[in-house]
């Protein structure tokens, strides 16, 4: 097999593995507005790009505050 074909085959296999991992991780996350109790012994993560809000303990969109 030529080197180019081997590289393509490796990239295809790697992308399939990453996709499988991403869908498995995404299946364990909770959506926007769902309760995300920070004190739970088995915490569940909010789906990307959500974060668990400190004041509401629900999944909210992540924000970045930049001070001028």
Curated annotation (Swiss-Prot):
One GO molecular-function entry: toxin activity
Principal location listed in the UniProt entry: secreted
Tissue: Expressed by the venom gland.
Subcellular location: Secreted
Keywords, sorted A to Z: Calcium channel impairing toxin, Disulfide bond, Ion channel impairing toxin, Knottin, Neurotoxin, Secreted, Signal, Toxin, Voltage-gated calcium channel impairing toxin
Keyword presence, Transmembrane helix: no
One CC-aspect GO term: extracellular region
Transmembrane segments: none
Disulfide pairings: 29-47, 36-52, 46-59
Endpoints of the signal sequence: 1-22
Comment field on protein domains: The presence of a 'disulfide through disulfide knot' structurally defines this protein as a knottin.
The family this protein is said to belong to: Belongs to the venom Ptu1-like knottin family.
Role this protein plays: Binds reversibly and blocks P/Q-type voltage-gated calcium channels (Cav).
Protein name stated in the entry: U-reduvitoxin-Pr3a
Species: Platymeris rhadamanthus
């Amino acid at each position: 097999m030529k080197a180019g074909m081997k590289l393509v085959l490796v990239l295809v296999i790697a992308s399939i593995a990453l996709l499988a991992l991403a869908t498995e991780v995404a299946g364990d996350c909770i959506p926007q507005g769902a309760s995300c109790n920070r004190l739970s012994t088995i915490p569940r993560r909010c789906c990307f790009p959500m974060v668990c809000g400190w004041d509401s303990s629900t999944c909210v969109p992540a924000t970045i505050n930049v001070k001028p």
